[in-house]
Amino acid sequence: MITTLIEKIKETKAPICVGLDPMLAYIPDEVKQAAFAEKGENLEGAAEACLRFNEAILRETADLIPAVKPQIAMYEQFGIPGLIAYEKTVRLAKELGLIVIADVKRGDIGSTSAAYAEGHLGLSLIHI
């Protein structure tokens, strides 16, 4: 796989990996509003907003970059709908010819740890 990544970096002339760590606070309001109008202001709507934002990023950057790195915790916080958004994001990235580096480690930085905690039913504390 590393050989493929190196070739893709040479092809794009971009030693860059775009992180796909969707946080609702950073998704444009128009994207969130459209997703909430279709799916509701719930986990499904939040996951749909993330997916739409990811799709836009992927389509705009696919010919410029070699790889993307979706952070699983940012999807898990939206439950099953979030995992579906993660799967669709990965599938689209692959269809667009991008290398996908899954960021699925546990024990991470503050925002990621908070997303893991939220993904576990909003519990006050979790042990990781």
Label each residue range with its predicted role.
Residues M1-E60:
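N-terminal glycine-rich anion-binding loop in soluble enzyme alpha/beta folds
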Residues V18, V68, D103:
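Conserved, mostly hydrophobic/aromatic
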Residues G19-A25, A73-Y75, K105-I109:
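Active-site beta-loop-alpha junctions enriched in small/polar residues
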Residues L58-L64, E95:
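Acidic (Asp/Glu)-rich catalytic clusters
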Residues P70-G82:
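Glycine-rich, proline-tolerant flexible connector loops at the mouths of alpha/beta enzymes
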Residues L83-I101:
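Alpha-helix-loop-beta-strand connector modules within alpha/beta enzyme cores
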Residues A102-G122:
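Glycine/small-residue-rich loop that forms an oxyanion/phosphate-binding "nest" at active or ligand-binding sites
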Residues I126-I128:
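Conserved small/polar residues in nucleotide/adenosyl-binding loops
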